[in-house]
Regions:
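Non-catalytic accessory segments flanking enzyme active sites
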Residues: 1-7, 19, 50-55, 63, ...
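Short loop/turn segments that connect beta-strands within beta-propeller blades
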Residues: 33-37, 78-82, 123-124
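A short beta-strand motif characteristic of beta-propeller blades
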Residues: 38-43, 83-88
Length: 177
């Protein structure tokens, strides 16, 4: 379905980007010309583009599951599909609030083992300023010595993969029953 979350018009007045499902069932980005129709796919692969964060010149910024289905990373790619760069680091779930023209954006990173970190970054992904480190909460959680979550995948009889996690007691001993 075409709406503001799946269609983005470019400043040239002639092109737009559509986030749509491929034949294989993955959401990807496609460049269209208003008069000629489809120009080319911008992204492709066995992973999802979950959002188009913005466009800056001839580059698209998008969030995807390329590293892992349980992770979101921000990428930059040229509209011709070349020059893809992952802008996020580590293992986290990234969300982005883009500024005008993607000159700057606010990036929120979260994961199961640490509190959110909120940063301002420039269009190259360079850190400009940390808005929220959550250092006090991070320290308090470390003092509590909470057990870590263990993430894993379970294959089904149909060939699907179910993602799961488990928390074991802090004093867990796998040899003890």
């Amino acid at each position: 379905r075409a709406d503001e979350s799946t269609v983005t018009f470019l400043d040239d007045g002639r092109h737009f980007i559509v986030r749509q499902e491929t034949d294989a069932g993955y959401m990807h980005l496609y460049l269209y010309d208003i008069d000629r129709g489809l120009v080319r796919p911008i992204t492709r692969g066995p992973w999802e583009v979950t959002a188009l964060a913005g466009v800056r010149g001839q580059q698209a910024y998008y969030l995807s599951t390329e590293v892992s289905p349980g992770q979101r990373d921000l990428y930059r790619i040229r509209l011709d599909g070349s020059g893809k760069v992952r802008l996020t680091e580590g293992r986290a779930f990234c969300s982005v609030a883009p500024g005008a023209g993607m000159d700057y954006y606010i990036q929120t990173l979260s994961n199961a083992s640490s509190p959110n970190r909120v940063e301002v970054r420039d269009h190259r992904g360079r850190l400009v300023r940390t808005l929220e480190e959550n250092a006090e909460l991070r320290g308090e959680l470390a003092r509590m010595k909470l057990p870590e979550r263990e993430f894993f995948a379970l294959p089904t009889e149909r060939g699907d993969t179910l993602r799961a996690w488990m928390i074991r007691p802090a004093d867990f001993d796998p040899a003890r029953r």
